[in-house]
Amino acid sequence: MLLDKLSVLSFLGLAPIFAAAQLSGSVGPLTSASTKAATKTCNVLDYGAKADKSTDLGAPLASAFADCKSGGLVYVPSGDYALSTWARLSGGEAWALQIDGIIYRTGTDGGNMIYIEHSSDFELFSSTSEGAMQGLGYEFHADDNWSGPRLLRLYEVTDFSVHDFILVDSPSFHFSLDTCTNGEIYNMAIRGGNHGGLDGIDVWSNNIWVHDVEVTNKDECVTVKGPSKNILIESIYCNWSGGCGMGSFGSDTNVSDITYRNIYTWSSNNMMLIKSNGGSGFVENVLLENFIGHGNAYSLDIDSYWASMSAVDGDGVQLSNITVKNWKGTEAYGAERGPVKVVCADGAPCYDITIEDFAMWTEEGDSQWYSCESAYGSGYCLQDSDDHVSYSVTTSTVSSAPSGYSATSMAADLTTDFGSTVSIPIPTIPTSFYPGATPYSALMANSASTAAASSIASHATVHSSSASVAASVPSAVAPSESIPAATSAVVSSAAAIAPSPAVGAQEGSTTSAPSFAAPSGAGNSPQGPTGASGFGEKGQQGEQGEQGEQGEQGVCYV
């Protein structure tokens, strides 16, 4: 239900310390949704919207935003809405978008169905954890059209969160974070078709925390593109997906301080793919920790000659200081696609690569291989030398399982994909994303009849788990799941004590944001990440849309 500004009280969230060294500062909105609603509430029904699944929501949503963009809450109540003209919501400050209804795509234009740009102190959420966008992408895909609209894109948004929201069956990408800063994404379910080009979450931004998200598709699960810095991605459930990755990378790559932690991958193309083909620049300071996989084609796949993208001019992207730690589980067929593949550019050999506590075994057959090229560091086929010169592919084959490879499975592992030419049902958001890990924030719908408010603090305070408010109740008590156990703390000028996350917490160091240079060409928006040709299109109003990746289309390796 709509936030009752008279009965719902905000609380000051005790946020985690910088959740890992990869976060450089606070994430999440600066004020709670209840505070914004108390300032002003703009209900789309008052602007001409109708929950009849046929009246266009586009104009009412834009009008409601215009009235609340300077401080307030835009409210889409429960019900079924049609969106035939896309909503470009630009220039908001201290505002929230509460979508408790389901928005169905009825238009056919390209671009982005909901595009939020140049905003600060922003929150998008569903108080029922059931709000959704249904892209009905199968209507495009049945005609072999893979370049329809994206569902949701944020561009140059600062101090924000998106949570308790569902994205289904996008004609193209589902969710893009483009040149954003200080954001938190959590408690989401994304379900797309079984085909390349239907990315789950793509991030090219600075100081972003993505956690507790499930993705089903056959391309990117949660992927970092360039330029990016200070990105923490954890508790991700790639449930019959393409898998998590980084790239594809081309010229002038600038990516650093990236952590993937607690990643569960089932029946996907890979557990982690770092991809490029030529190009220049660097990827450095990467931690890939606590991965569990079953039934995937590839496990660790670092490929600097990735054949699914056209070669880019340059000696190659320089990869360095990458740690792969605590990987368990099984791959589909290790004799055909081994669990360790580290192929670096001959013109830019990678170095300081560490693979430790890594135990994977094949589900089919009785052997598997490890393969390296121009790769230096420690573990498996990596060469240990200070002379980082190129060398040819070296492959070793083993015929006995490593000790300790056995790993648990998730009860919700899908038994089949959803295809790409029939309607995909809207899922519920799960309450478990990685075996044994409790989500950082309870679903708003499951908050024990409480209202979890966003942290209210100065920008210097570390924010996190920034759930706004759920059902109307006389008082608000934070759900126990929303605040991890305290281990150490940072005290801000507001004297807020910040417990750290339960896994691998450490104090983060503040670093400068990467430079996001505007490209030449139409419009003033930035150039998106460079990818293989296939699914990108020019966006709206002169926007230079990011180029999509073709991926391994329709491939299922199990």
From Swiss-Prot:
Superkingdom assignment: Eukaryota
Gene Ontology biological-process entries: cell wall organization; pectin catabolic process
Signal peptide region: 1-21
Enzyme class: hydrolase
Main location as per UniProt: secreted
Gene Ontology CC entries for this record: extracellular region
Enzyme active site: 219, 294
Ranges where the record places region Disordered: 503-558
Cystine crosslinks: 42-68, 221-238, 344-350, 372-381
Glycosylation sites: 145, 239, 254, 321
Known catalytic reactions: Endohydrolysis of alpha-D-GalA-(1->2)-alpha-L-Rha glycosidic bond in the rhamnogalacturonan I backbone with initial inversion of anomeric configuration releasing oligosaccharides with beta-D-GalA at the reducing end
Coiled coil location: none
UniProt function note: Pectinolytic enzymes consist of four classes of enzymes: pectine lyase, polygalacturonase, pectin methylesterase and rhamnogalacturonase. Hydrolyzes alpha-D-galacturonopyranosyl-(1,2)-alpha-L-rhamnopyranosyl linkages in the backbone of the hairy regions of pectins.
Name under which the protein is recorded: Rhamnogalacturonase B
Organism encoding this protein: Aspergillus niger
